[in-house]
Amino acid sequence: MVSSEKGLPESFVPGKRQSDGTSDLSTAVNVKWGVKIGTAFFSTPSVAGGKVFVGGLDRDEGIFVCFDAATGKRLWQWQAPPREVPGTIDGFSIGLATIPHQIGVCSSAAVDGDRVYFVSNRCDLMCLDVAGQSAEPDAGQARVVWTYDMLEQLGVFPCDASNGSPLIVGDLLYVATCNGVDRNTFGAPAKEKERKIPAPHAPNLIVVDKRDGRLVATDEAPIMQGLLHGQWSSPSLGRVGDRTLVFYGGGDGVCYAFEALASVPEQPVRLKTVWSYDCIPPEYKAPGDGDWITHYCLGDRRVKGTLNKHDGTFVGRCEIIATPVFVNNRVYVAIGRDPAHGRGRGALHCIDARGQGDITAGGKIWTYQGLDRTLSTVSVADGLVYVSDVGGRLHCLDDATGQCYWIHDTDCETWGSTLVADGKVYMPTTKGLWVLATGKELKVLGRITLGGKVYASPVVANGTLYVATTQGWLWAAGQQ
């Protein structure tokens, strides 16, 4: 992510955490407020209209909370238990009978006027009123405008989490369904014939009318044919020539470009696939006549007989978890896997977005293979690309050539994405937030310890940096 905000802190001290779930500001430095709500925050905060929206977990229930951006006061909260799903589908025993897997709401919110949209821990696309409920006895609770149940309406079955973040384009919402495989596939080196996809015909990306939640379009990408695990990427948007395209990173390791709808159709239609680009380098695929599903499973360091030494050297297939980034007719996107599978070789691609059809060969501008698997969305600013990997390294590359200028090793895992703003690169890790200077020379400005892991990405608005931790704390930092 990139922001034009200025005057941001290069360091802050959270201060003493108090028993009432707030920060003692007399012991803090460059902190406007800090609050603890629930057990953990996994989603990246969204800031709009003087409010902060963030999803998380409270014990075993998903939560979505709205705060006052200036004071940290909780204005309202939505909360729901995990969803029980059928234990068998089409005669198959399904390993995950609860959605999601103890991680709550992971989707980041999209805000448009007086409405806020997100995907819940129950695989529902939610539309809430940003004002919440004001009248007793419901004051402090969310006001639901509409709900679209993707599991019930589409038959999708998320693997681990339903965490896609909505994309607003006019009156339309583009949302990933998070359809995936049965988690039992990864209990042992499964053969291809043993792989279970509970919903093999469900869509991967849908479009709904943001005003009433009506389904208006679905994709027809052949992702299920090569689905590896789950689908945790989110769609993005770009204008290419006279076309508006929606980009999506598939669970098969392929980046897709769909033509955006020009208007809201009266009846559901199919999205037109403009191009596809296979982000899995040929040498990463199963060697010889090897079963590619078995090879993928053996890349999970927890599996018996694993080939993964957790040192970043394992080479194998990966899905796309990061969100594709569009800049100047180019798409930047990297491949990765669930961090629990361990480290392994990744790949970052720069793709010419002006193509048509299968552009794997002709659309390649450059590929960088010097990074580990990654979940992180890249930041592109001032001719440079910043991307972190699961191994905890931050890479700075030339955006036109892919030349690597420097690598900073934090010696800890990274799940979130970088934020570039005010001449700084903010990098979330499992041991806090690193701050580095932008540019072709490596310069570390500091590390901020927050008392918990930072899986979400930091965001900035109105001179304030917002950072959420897995301990359920949300911090608002600014120059003082």
Question: Which functions belong to the PLM regions below?
Answer:
Residues 1-480:
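Noncatalytic, solvent-exposed loop/strand surfaces
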